[in-house]
């Protein structure tokens, strides 16, 4: 699951990246 997978929704992509930034694995 990556930003490229949710390219259909830029908002989802942003939230995905934000979530990763807030919770670094």
Curated annotation (Swiss-Prot):
Tissues/organs with expression: Detected in seeds (at protein level).
UniProtKB keywords: Antibiotic, Antimicrobial, Disulfide bond, Fungicide, Lipid-binding, Plant defense, Transport
Annotated GO MF terms: lipid binding
GO term, biological process aspect, one: killing of cells of another organism
Keyword match Protein biosynthesis: no
Top-rank lineage group of the source organism: Eukaryota
Family: Belongs to the plant LTP family.
UniProt function note: Plant non-specific lipid-transfer proteins transfer phospholipids as well as galactolipids across membranes. May play a role in wax or cutin deposition in the cell walls of expanding epidermal cells and certain secretory tissues. Has antibacterial and antifungal activity. Inhibits the growth of P.infestans.
Name of the protein described by the UniProt record: Non-specific lipid-transfer protein 2
